[in-house]
Curated annotation (Swiss-Prot):
Positions of crosslink type Glycyl lysine isopeptide (Gly-Lys) (interchain with K-? in acceptor proteins): G93
Compartments (UniProt record): Nucleus
Domain Ubiquitin-like: 16-95
Cross-link (Glycyl lysine isopeptide (Lys-Gly) (interchain with G-Cter in SUMO)): K11
Purpose of the protein: Ubiquitin-like protein that can be covalently attached to proteins as a monomer or as a lysine-linked polymer. Covalent attachment via an isopeptide bond to its substrates requires prior activation by the E1 complex sae1-sae2 and linkage to the E2 enzyme ube2i, and can be promoted by an E3 ligase such as pias1-4. This post-translational modification on lysine residues of proteins plays a crucial role in a number of cellular processes such as nuclear transport, DNA replication and repair, mitosis and signal transduction.
Propeptide section residues: 94-95
Chain segments annotated as transmembrane: none
Annotated organism of origin: Xenopus tropicalis (Western clawed frog)
Protein name, per record: Small ubiquitin-related modifier 2
One GO CC term, this protein: nucleus
InterPro entries associated with the record: Rad60/SUMO-like_dom, Ubiquitin-like_dom, Ubiquitin-like_domsf
């Protein structure tokens, strides 16, 4: 019997889409399906609209590194089911 599912950990280069999770600080997780060569600003804007947030209020990070709007999943070497973390923008402070 042939197994049609790709093996765990094996990259399928012919698959143009990738499933990404966006995890908020409140524990919420939103899933997106995006093309590997599509700039991540499309995902960022969709997340903000869905959550009722402004792009100015939050920051997106992958593996601890800030994500630029022009970055693509392919450039960041993202794999299927990877998670992007969302953080509230810190403003001000007090002494």
């Amino acid at each position: 019997m042939a197994d049609d599912k790709p093996k765990e950990g094996v990259k399928t280069e012919n698959n143009d889409h990738i499933n990404l999770k966006v995890a908020g600080q409140d524990g919420s997780v939103v899933q997106f399906k995006i093309k590997r060569h599509t700039p991540l600003n499309k995902l960022m804007k969709a997340y903000c609209e869905r959550q009722g947030l402004s792009m100015r209020q939050i920051r997106f990070r992958f593996d601890g590194q800030p994500i630029n709007e022009t970055d693509t999943p392919a450039q960041l070497e993202m794999e299927d089911e990877d998670t992007i973390d969302v953080f509230q923008q810190q403003t001000g402070g007090s002494f």
